[in-house]
Protein backbone atom coordinates (compact mmCIF):
# COMPACT_ATOMS: atom_id res chain seq x y z
CA UNK A 1 0.00 0.00 0.00
CA UNK A 2 2.81 2.41 0.85
CA UNK A 3 4.53 1.71 -2.49
CA UNK A 4 1.29 2.32 -4.38
CA UNK A 5 0.83 5.65 -2.63
CA UNK A 6 4.35 6.74 -3.53
CA UNK A 7 3.83 5.79 -7.17
CA UNK A 8 0.52 7.61 -7.45
CA UNK A 9 2.04 10.76 -5.97
CA UNK A 10 4.22 11.11 -9.07
CA UNK A 11 2.54 12.60 -12.12
CA UNK A 12 3.81 9.83 -14.41
CA UNK A 13 2.23 6.98 -12.48
CA UNK A 14 -1.23 5.64 -13.17
CA UNK A 15 -3.36 5.36 -10.06
CA UNK A 16 -4.49 1.93 -8.94
CA UNK A 17 -8.13 1.01 -9.20
CA UNK A 18 -9.84 1.94 -5.93
CA UNK A 19 -13.14 0.16 -5.45
CA UNK A 20 -15.92 0.58 -2.96
CA UNK A 21 -17.48 -2.80 -2.17
CA UNK A 22 -20.99 -3.03 -0.74
CA UNK A 23 -22.13 -6.30 0.80
CA UNK A 24 -25.79 -7.15 1.26
CA UNK A 25 -27.51 -8.25 4.43
CA UNK A 26 -26.83 -11.60 6.05
CA UNK A 27 -28.78 -13.93 8.29
CA UNK A 28 -27.28 -13.13 11.70
CA UNK A 29 -28.13 -9.96 13.70
CA UNK A 30 -24.66 -8.46 13.19
CA UNK A 31 -25.17 -8.45 9.40
CA UNK A 32 -28.73 -7.11 9.13
CA UNK A 33 -27.56 -3.72 7.88
CA UNK A 34 -25.00 -4.88 5.34
CA UNK A 35 -21.30 -4.07 5.20
CA UNK A 36 -18.80 -2.02 3.18
CA UNK A 37 -15.13 -2.33 2.29
CA UNK A 38 -12.63 -0.50 0.13
CA UNK A 39 -10.24 -2.32 -2.21
CA UNK A 40 -7.09 -1.50 -4.20
CA UNK A 41 -6.15 -3.15 -7.51
CA UNK A 42 -3.47 -2.57 -10.10
CA UNK A 43 -5.02 -1.57 -13.44
CA UNK A 44 -5.39 -4.60 -15.73
CA UNK A 45 -4.15 -7.08 -13.11
CA UNK A 46 -6.11 -9.57 -10.99
CA UNK A 47 -5.92 -9.75 -7.23
CA UNK A 48 -5.82 -6.75 -4.98
CA UNK A 49 -6.37 -6.02 -1.32
CA UNK A 50 -9.41 -4.91 0.65
CA UNK A 51 -9.56 -2.93 3.85
CA UNK A 52 -12.27 -3.97 6.29
CA UNK A 53 -13.12 -1.43 9.00
CA UNK A 54 -15.68 -3.77 10.59
CA UNK A 55 -13.34 -6.30 12.16
CA UNK A 56 -14.17 -7.31 15.74
CA UNK A 57 -14.18 -10.36 17.98
CA UNK A 58 -17.69 -11.61 17.22
CA UNK A 59 -16.94 -14.92 19.00
CA UNK A 60 -17.56 -13.15 22.33
CA UNK A 61 -21.01 -11.55 21.81
CA UNK A 62 -21.67 -10.77 25.49
CA UNK A 63 -18.48 -8.71 26.10
CA UNK A 64 -18.93 -7.13 22.67
CA UNK A 65 -22.52 -6.11 23.49
CA UNK A 66 -21.57 -4.74 26.91
CA UNK A 67 -18.74 -2.81 25.31
CA UNK A 68 -21.14 -1.42 22.72
CA UNK A 69 -23.50 -0.19 25.46
CA UNK A 70 -20.63 1.61 27.17
CA UNK A 71 -19.17 2.98 23.95
CA UNK A 72 -16.11 0.79 24.45
CA UNK A 73 -16.60 -1.89 21.76
CA UNK A 74 -13.24 -2.24 20.01
CA UNK A 75 -13.33 -2.54 16.23
CA UNK A 76 -10.34 -2.34 13.92
CA UNK A 77 -9.30 -2.23 10.28
CA UNK A 78 -7.86 -5.36 8.70
CA UNK A 79 -6.30 -5.87 5.25
CA UNK A 80 -7.54 -8.91 3.33
CA UNK A 81 -7.11 -10.46 -0.10
CA UNK A 82 -9.76 -9.09 -2.45
CA UNK A 83 -10.66 -12.42 -4.06
CA UNK A 84 -10.98 -14.21 -0.75
CA UNK A 85 -13.09 -11.37 0.62
CA UNK A 86 -15.58 -11.55 -2.25
CA UNK A 87 -15.68 -15.35 -2.13
CA UNK A 88 -16.40 -15.32 1.61
CA UNK A 89 -19.40 -13.00 1.29
CA UNK A 90 -20.67 -14.93 -1.73
CA UNK A 91 -20.44 -18.15 0.30
CA UNK A 92 -22.57 -16.39 2.94
CA UNK A 93 -25.15 -15.73 0.19
CA UNK A 94 -24.73 -11.98 0.48
CA UNK A 95 -24.93 -9.74 -2.57
CA UNK A 96 -21.60 -8.14 -3.52
CA UNK A 97 -21.49 -4.87 -5.50
CA UNK A 98 -18.50 -2.81 -6.54
CA UNK A 99 -18.08 0.82 -7.55
CA UNK A 100 -14.85 1.97 -9.19
CA UNK A 101 -14.18 5.38 -7.70
CA UNK A 102 -13.39 8.01 -10.39
CA UNK A 103 -10.44 9.68 -8.67
CA UNK A 104 -7.69 11.89 -10.01
CA UNK A 105 -4.07 10.97 -9.28
CA UNK A 106 -3.97 13.50 -6.47
CA UNK A 107 -7.23 12.26 -4.97
CA UNK A 108 -6.13 8.63 -5.22
CA UNK A 109 -2.82 9.46 -3.53
CA UNK A 110 -4.61 11.34 -0.75
CA UNK A 111 -7.03 8.46 -0.18
CA UNK A 112 -4.24 5.88 -0.21
CA UNK A 113 -2.23 7.87 2.31
CA UNK A 114 -5.28 8.17 4.56
CA UNK A 115 -5.98 4.43 4.31
CA UNK A 116 -2.37 3.60 5.16
CA UNK A 117 -2.51 5.89 8.19
CA UNK A 118 -5.81 4.32 9.30
CA UNK A 119 -4.27 0.84 9.12
CA UNK A 120 -1.21 1.76 11.21
CA UNK A 121 -0.97 -0.18 14.50
CA UNK A 122 -1.49 2.93 16.61
CA UNK A 123 -4.53 4.04 14.57
CA UNK A 124 -6.29 0.87 13.48
CA UNK A 125 -8.52 0.51 16.56
CA UNK A 126 -11.59 2.63 17.18
CA UNK A 127 -14.67 2.73 19.42
CA UNK A 128 -17.66 1.54 17.48
CA UNK A 129 -20.96 3.43 17.33
CA UNK A 130 -23.70 2.06 15.11
CA UNK A 131 -24.78 5.43 13.69
CA UNK A 132 -21.75 7.69 14.06
CA UNK A 133 -18.61 5.57 13.74
CA UNK A 134 -18.80 2.23 11.98
CA UNK A 135 -17.33 0.25 9.09
CA UNK A 136 -19.03 2.49 6.53
CA UNK A 137 -18.67 5.94 8.09
CA UNK A 138 -14.91 5.35 8.41
CA UNK A 139 -14.62 4.89 4.64
CA UNK A 140 -17.07 7.74 3.98
CA UNK A 141 -15.00 10.20 6.02
CA UNK A 142 -11.68 9.22 4.42
CA UNK A 143 -13.15 9.40 0.92
CA UNK A 144 -14.81 12.75 1.58
CA UNK A 145 -11.55 14.21 2.85
CA UNK A 146 -9.65 12.93 -0.19
CA UNK A 147 -12.08 14.47 -2.70
CA UNK A 148 -12.22 17.86 -1.03
CA UNK A 149 -15.50 17.47 0.85
CA UNK A 150 -17.69 16.79 -2.18
CA UNK A 151 -19.68 14.13 -0.33
CA UNK A 152 -20.43 16.25 2.71
CA UNK A 153 -20.93 19.57 0.90
CA UNK A 154 -24.59 18.96 0.13
CA UNK A 155 -25.53 15.84 2.05
CA UNK A 156 -25.08 17.33 5.52
CA UNK A 157 -27.91 19.77 4.86
CA UNK A 158 -30.11 17.40 2.84
CA UNK A 159 -32.67 15.26 4.63
CA UNK A 160 -32.70 11.54 3.96
CA UNK A 161 -36.46 11.56 4.45
CA UNK A 162 -36.23 8.99 7.24
CA UNK A 163 -35.51 8.80 10.95
CA UNK A 164 -32.82 6.58 12.44
CA UNK A 165 -35.60 4.37 13.82
CA UNK A 166 -36.96 3.87 10.31
CA UNK A 167 -33.54 2.60 9.24
CA UNK A 168 -33.46 0.26 12.25
CA UNK A 169 -36.89 -1.10 11.38
CA UNK A 170 -35.78 -1.78 7.81
CA UNK A 171 -32.75 -3.67 9.08
CA UNK A 172 -34.80 -5.82 11.47
CA UNK A 173 -37.81 -6.26 9.19
CA UNK A 174 -37.42 -10.05 9.04
CA UNK A 175 -37.14 -10.46 12.83
CA UNK A 176 -40.33 -9.70 14.74
CA UNK A 177 -38.80 -10.12 18.20
CA UNK A 178 -35.91 -7.75 17.46
CA UNK A 179 -38.36 -5.21 16.03
CA UNK A 180 -40.53 -5.39 19.15
CA UNK A 181 -37.51 -5.04 21.44
CA UNK A 182 -36.23 -2.08 19.42
CA UNK A 183 -39.51 -0.25 20.10
CA UNK A 184 -39.01 -0.78 23.84
CA UNK A 185 -35.24 -0.39 24.25
CA UNK A 186 -34.22 2.30 21.73
CA UNK A 187 -35.00 5.81 22.87
CA UNK A 188 -36.07 9.14 21.45
CA UNK A 189 -32.73 10.09 19.89
CA UNK A 190 -33.45 7.53 17.17
CA UNK A 191 -36.62 9.39 16.19
CA UNK A 192 -34.94 12.50 14.84
CA UNK A 193 -34.64 12.83 11.05
CA UNK A 194 -31.31 11.74 9.60
CA UNK A 195 -29.53 13.84 7.01
CA UNK A 196 -28.28 12.16 3.84
CA UNK A 197 -24.78 12.37 5.30
CA UNK A 198 -25.86 10.65 8.52
CA UNK A 199 -27.81 8.02 6.59
CA UNK A 200 -24.51 6.92 5.08
CA UNK A 201 -23.90 4.84 8.21
CA UNK A 202 -25.79 2.30 6.08
CA UNK A 203 -23.67 0.72 3.33
CA UNK A 204 -26.58 0.86 0.87
CA UNK A 205 -27.13 4.59 1.50
CA UNK A 206 -23.39 5.23 1.10
CA UNK A 207 -23.41 3.31 -2.18
CA UNK A 208 -26.33 5.38 -3.49
CA UNK A 209 -24.78 8.71 -2.49
CA UNK A 210 -21.44 7.80 -4.06
CA UNK A 211 -23.26 6.94 -7.29
CA UNK A 212 -25.25 10.18 -7.29
CA UNK A 213 -22.41 12.54 -6.36
CA UNK A 214 -19.39 10.86 -7.94
CA UNK A 215 -21.07 9.05 -10.83
CA UNK A 216 -19.72 5.65 -9.73
CA UNK A 217 -22.29 3.12 -10.93
CA UNK A 218 -22.58 -0.12 -8.92
CA UNK A 219 -21.73 -3.41 -10.64
CA UNK A 220 -23.00 -6.67 -9.18
CA UNK A 221 -20.25 -9.23 -8.65
CA UNK A 222 -22.51 -11.72 -6.86
CA UNK A 223 -26.28 -11.68 -6.45
CA UNK A 224 -27.79 -13.28 -3.37
CA UNK A 225 -30.65 -15.73 -3.71
CA UNK A 226 -32.12 -14.27 -0.53
CA UNK A 227 -35.55 -12.76 -1.21
CA UNK A 228 -35.80 -9.14 -0.11
CA UNK A 229 -39.34 -8.41 1.07
CA UNK A 230 -40.15 -4.71 1.61
CA UNK A 231 -41.23 -3.87 5.16
CA UNK A 232 -44.85 -2.75 4.84
CA UNK A 233 -46.46 -4.14 8.01
CA UNK A 234 -45.32 -2.88 11.46
CA UNK A 235 -44.76 -6.42 12.73
CA UNK A 236 -42.96 -5.30 15.89
CA UNK A 237 -45.95 -3.23 16.97
CA UNK A 238 -48.29 -6.08 16.03
CA UNK A 239 -46.28 -8.44 18.25
CA UNK A 240 -46.64 -6.06 21.21
CA UNK A 241 -50.36 -5.65 20.56
CA UNK A 242 -50.80 -9.40 20.23
CA UNK A 243 -49.15 -10.00 23.59
CA UNK A 244 -51.33 -7.39 25.26
CA UNK A 245 -54.51 -8.83 23.74
CA UNK A 246 -53.67 -12.45 24.61
CA UNK A 247 -52.53 -11.51 28.13
CA UNK A 248 -55.73 -9.52 28.76
CA UNK A 249 -57.86 -12.44 27.59
CA UNK A 250 -56.02 -14.96 29.78
CA UNK A 251 -56.26 -12.64 32.79
CA UNK A 252 -60.00 -12.30 32.19
CA UNK A 253 -60.60 -16.05 32.20
CA UNK A 254 -57.94 -17.03 34.75
CA UNK A 255 -59.91 -15.97 37.83
CA UNK A 256 -61.95 -19.17 37.58
CA UNK A 257 -58.88 -21.37 37.15
CA UNK A 258 -56.94 -23.07 39.92
CA UNK A 259 -53.62 -21.56 38.95
CA UNK A 260 -55.01 -18.18 37.92
CA UNK A 261 -52.88 -16.18 40.36
CA UNK A 262 -49.68 -17.71 39.02
CA UNK A 263 -50.75 -17.11 35.44
CA UNK A 264 -51.60 -13.47 36.12
CA UNK A 265 -48.27 -12.95 37.85
CA UNK A 266 -46.42 -14.46 34.89
CA UNK A 267 -48.28 -12.34 32.34
CA UNK A 268 -47.61 -9.12 34.27
CA UNK A 269 -43.98 -10.11 34.93
CA UNK A 270 -43.15 -9.97 31.20
CA UNK A 271 -43.65 -6.19 30.76
CA UNK A 272 -42.17 -5.67 34.22
CA UNK A 273 -38.98 -7.53 33.27
CA UNK A 274 -38.82 -5.69 29.95
CA UNK A 275 -39.09 -2.43 31.86
CA UNK A 276 -36.33 -3.58 34.20
CA UNK A 277 -34.14 -4.46 31.22
CA UNK A 278 -34.78 -1.13 29.50
CA UNK A 279 -34.05 0.70 32.74
CA UNK A 280 -30.78 -1.14 33.35
CA UNK A 281 -29.68 -0.48 29.77
CA UNK A 282 -30.51 3.22 30.16
CA UNK A 283 -28.43 3.37 33.36
CA UNK A 284 -25.50 1.36 31.98
CA UNK A 285 -25.27 2.71 28.43
CA UNK A 286 -23.81 6.04 27.37
CA UNK A 287 -25.32 6.27 23.87
CA UNK A 288 -28.01 8.93 23.73
CA UNK A 289 -30.40 6.66 21.83
CA UNK A 290 -30.35 4.14 24.70
CA UNK A 291 -30.26 6.50 27.70
CA UNK A 292 -33.30 8.70 27.07
CA UNK A 293 -36.05 6.11 26.62
CA UNK A 294 -39.69 7.23 26.73
CA UNK A 295 -40.86 3.61 26.79
CA UNK A 296 -39.91 3.57 30.50
CA UNK A 297 -43.02 5.68 31.06
CA UNK A 298 -45.10 2.74 29.83
CA UNK A 299 -43.28 -0.35 31.12
CA UNK A 300 -41.66 -0.34 34.57
CA UNK A 301 -40.41 -2.97 37.04
CA UNK A 302 -43.19 -1.79 39.37
CA UNK A 303 -45.91 -3.38 37.23
CA UNK A 304 -46.20 -6.11 39.90
CA UNK A 305 -48.14 -3.57 41.99
CA UNK A 306 -51.02 -4.07 39.55
CA UNK A 307 -51.48 -7.58 40.99
CA UNK A 308 -52.38 -6.30 44.46
CA UNK A 309 -56.00 -6.59 45.56
CA UNK A 310 -55.92 -3.72 48.07
CA UNK A 311 -56.39 0.01 47.60
CA UNK A 312 -52.78 0.50 46.48
CA UNK A 313 -53.25 -1.97 43.65
CA UNK A 314 -56.45 -0.27 42.57
CA UNK A 315 -54.83 3.18 42.62
CA UNK A 316 -51.86 1.84 40.65
CA UNK A 317 -53.98 0.29 37.90
CA UNK A 318 -56.25 3.30 37.49
CA UNK A 319 -53.44 5.81 37.85
CA UNK A 320 -51.36 4.06 35.21
CA UNK A 321 -54.20 4.05 32.71
CA UNK A 322 -54.72 7.76 33.38
CA UNK A 323 -51.00 8.36 32.84
CA UNK A 324 -51.20 6.47 29.54
CA UNK A 325 -53.86 8.92 28.35
CA UNK A 326 -51.53 11.82 29.19
CA UNK A 327 -48.64 10.08 27.38
CA UNK A 328 -50.82 9.61 24.30
CA UNK A 329 -51.68 13.32 24.30
CA UNK A 330 -48.02 14.30 24.70
CA UNK A 331 -47.13 12.02 21.80
CA UNK A 332 -49.85 13.51 19.61
CA UNK A 333 -48.56 16.99 20.48
CA UNK A 334 -44.99 16.13 19.52
CA UNK A 335 -43.59 16.42 23.04
CA UNK A 336 -42.84 12.70 23.15
CA UNK A 337 -41.20 11.32 20.01
CA UNK A 338 -41.13 7.55 20.32
CA UNK A 339 -43.86 5.39 18.72
CA UNK A 340 -45.41 4.21 21.98
CA UNK A 341 -48.92 3.47 20.71
CA UNK A 342 -48.64 -0.31 20.65
CA UNK A 343 -47.22 -0.58 24.17
CA UNK A 344 -49.79 1.94 25.47
CA UNK A 345 -52.68 -0.11 24.07
CA UNK A 346 -51.16 -3.41 25.24
CA UNK A 347 -50.61 -2.19 28.81
CA UNK A 348 -54.05 -0.57 28.95
CA UNK A 349 -55.63 -3.90 27.97
CA UNK A 350 -53.61 -5.78 30.60
CA UNK A 351 -54.31 -3.31 33.42
CA UNK A 352 -57.97 -3.08 32.42
CA UNK A 353 -58.34 -6.84 32.57
CA UNK A 354 -56.66 -6.89 35.98
CA UNK A 355 -58.94 -4.14 37.26
CA UNK A 356 -62.01 -6.10 36.19
CA UNK A 357 -60.60 -9.33 37.66
CA UNK A 358 -59.79 -7.56 40.94
CA UNK A 359 -63.19 -5.86 41.29
CA UNK A 360 -65.32 -6.92 44.31
CA UNK A 361 -68.00 -8.29 42.00
CA UNK A 362 -65.50 -10.44 40.14
CA UNK A 363 -63.95 -11.59 43.43
CA UNK A 364 -67.36 -12.71 44.75
CA UNK A 365 -68.00 -14.53 41.48
Which residues make up each language-model segment?
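A structural motif
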Residues: 103-116
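Membrane-proximal intrinsically disordered regions of secretory-pathway and membrane-system proteins
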Residues: 8-13, 223
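Glycine-rich catalytic cores of cysteine/serine-nucleophile enzymes that process amide/ester linkages
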Residues: 14-95
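Sec-dependent N-terminal signal peptides of Gram-negative exported proteins
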Residues: 1-7
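Activation targets extended, charge/polar-rich intrinsically disordered C-terminal tails
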Residues: 117-365
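Second-shell loop/turn segments in exported
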Residues: 26-27, 93-102, 121-130
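N-proximal short alpha-helices
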Residues: 80-84, 112, 277
Amino acid sequence: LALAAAQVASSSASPPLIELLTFGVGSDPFSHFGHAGICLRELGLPGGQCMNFGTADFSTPVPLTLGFLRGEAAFWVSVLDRGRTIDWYAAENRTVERQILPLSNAEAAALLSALIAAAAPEMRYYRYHHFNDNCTTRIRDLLDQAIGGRLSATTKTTSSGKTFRAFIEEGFKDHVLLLALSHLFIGRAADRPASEWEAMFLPSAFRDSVERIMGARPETLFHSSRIDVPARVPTGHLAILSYGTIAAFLISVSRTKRYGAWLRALLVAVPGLLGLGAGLIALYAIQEELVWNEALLVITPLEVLALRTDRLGRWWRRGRVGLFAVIALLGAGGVLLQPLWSSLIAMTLILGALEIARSPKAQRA
